[in-house]
Amino acid sequence: MKLKKTLTYQHHAYSFLSDNTNEVLENPKEILFVKTPLNEKYAPLIAEKNLAILDFNELKNYFDFKIKIVGITGTNGKTTTASLMYSLLLDLNKKTALLGTRGFFIDDKHIKEKGLTTPTLLELYSDLEEAIRLKCEYFIMEVSSHAIVQKRIAGLDFALKILTNITSDHLDFHQNIENYRDAKNSFFKDEGLKVINRDETNALFNPINARTYALDKKAHLNVQAFSLNPSISASLCYQHDLRDPNLKETALIHSPLLGRYNLYNILAGVLGVKLLTQLPLETIAPLLENFYGVKGRLEIVHSKPLVVVDFAHTTDGMQQVFESFKNQKITALFGAGGDRDKTKRPKMGAIASCYAHQIILTSDNPRSENEEDIIKDILKGINNSSKVIVEKDRKKAILNALENLKDDEVLLILGKGDENIQIFKDKTIFFSDQEVVKDYYLNLKQG
């Protein structure tokens, strides 16, 4: 991308930065090439022309980011935790930007549509400049494992880093679980302020300036008691110094969110906001009632019978959703993304068979893969095939599930969340799980 930026480099004045060699070669007098891990193989094309090359590690020297950047990483919970913090800070009258899977937002305005969880380095710098121009105090961003490995966050000084959890995902990119864990944990090696899920056994971090939250272990922010029925209520206790039990803050919270895993997201978000603002816990706690969650994350699309859409596309993510409804009769409808980690497919089938009384296997985003082959991979993990229905057409699968759903049952439509497209080998179509459900019940009502 091309970023408007006036700077002098190697005694030459430039008006733009770009990580695209074609853009630079078209106008080398005005555009300075920025070399990153993603485009370094093209750098010789620039060098052959004797043009200047700015290494991505030097980029930060030409920007003055007077804004508190918060980076949130983890297998699950990034989007909800980031959105929760954004909501809390806005309610506290703090001018805040949010960047992540759902797009770029500033002060409740949708600035840019969704793209990568973490954009390219120049896009990120561009978004930061826009947030600063609009006088934001905080910049909340999701940080993917890809972005960490590809150094898409190079040069940023984080005011706070947050870890939600580490399970297994993106093994098509990282090759194995060890590399994936190492990528996540590498984000927390420095001595900066960090918030860590103390119950996460895979977490490795520098203990200097680490603050923790947990349900099961002793941590800086703990839950003394909680209820998940029908939504989250809890008594929280915060200790700034774990060695001094007399210095405590407590607060009662009530949240419209569902499920134990959302209680973890709440703990991460509340602790993050407390550390950033230094406000009392009892000032932050009441604001949780204003946050109703994120579209496509445990989203109730219809209440009776209960139909829920969720982004869960990993074994751990699916289990957390299932746990939220384990006392109900579950129909689970899902597929798996094509051209992605194949090893998780049978595991997804296995976890669904543990919780669901009926499983409907369908397409997700098959991309270049054959839909039937993806479904066969999922079936390998399901012992009882009698509870399985296969319908590769996702719309038909959802409609069939709705037609057979009883009032005391719950339909969990998993994998795509708030996505509004479906990607095939030769086409991309508009598709929304929510719209299919809403249209069905609207037509039913109209007769």
Swiss-Prot record:
Organism name? Helicobacter pylori (strain J99 / ATCC 700824)
Q: Which InterPro entries match?
A: Folylpolyglutamate_synth_CS, Mur-like_cat_sf, Mur_ligase_C, Mur_ligase_C_dom_sf, Mur_ligase_cen, UDP-N-AcMur-Glu-dNH2Pim_ligase
Per the Swiss-Prot or TrEMBL annotation, the motif Meso-diaminopimelate recognition motif is positioned at 364-367
Protein known as: UDP-N-acetylmuramoyl-L-alanyl-D-glutamate--2,6-diaminopimelate ligase
Which Gene3D superfamilies does the UniProt entry name for this protein?
A: Mur ligase, C-terminal domain (3.90.190.20), Mur-like, catalytic domain (3.40.1190.10)
Q: Which family does it belong to?
A: Belongs to the MurCDEF family. MurE subfamily.
- Tell me a GO biological process for this protein: cell wall organization
- UniProt keyword terms in alphabetical order: ATP-binding, Cell cycle, Cell division, Cell shape, Cell wall biogenesis/degradation, Cytoplasm, Ligase, Magnesium, Nucleotide-binding, Peptidoglycan synthesis
Report which reactions are catalysed by this protein: UDP-N-acetyl-alpha-D-muramoyl-L-alanyl-D-glutamate + meso-2,6-diaminopimelate + ATP = UDP-N-acetyl-alpha-D-muramoyl-L-alanyl-gamma-D-glutamyl-meso-2,6-diaminopimelate + ADP + phosphate + H(+)
What does it do?
Answer: Catalyzes the addition of meso-diaminopimelic acid to the nucleotide precursor UDP-N-acetylmuramoyl-L-alanyl-D-glutamate (UMAG) in the biosynthesis of bacterial cell-wall peptidoglycan.
- List cofactor names only: Mg(2+)
Q: Any idea which positions bind ATP? A: G74, T75, N76, G77, K78, T79, T80
Q: Give the enzyme's EC designation.
A: 6.3.2.13
Tell me which residues bear N6-carboxylysine: K184
**Residues reported in the UniProt entry to bind meso-2,6-diaminopimelate:** R340, D364, N365, P366, R367, G415, E419
Q: Where in the cell is it found?
A: Cytoplasm
One Gene Ontology cellular component term attached to this UniProt record is: cytoplasm
Pathways per UniProt = Cell wall biogenesis; peptidoglycan biosynthesis
Recorded coiled-coil stretches: none
GO MF terms here are:
ATP binding; magnesium ion binding; tetrahydrofolylpolyglutamate synthase activity; UDP-N-acetylmuramoylalanyl-D-glutamate-2,6-diaminopimelate ligase activity
Q: Which Pfam families match?
A: Mur_ligase_C (PF02875), Mur_ligase_M (PF08245)
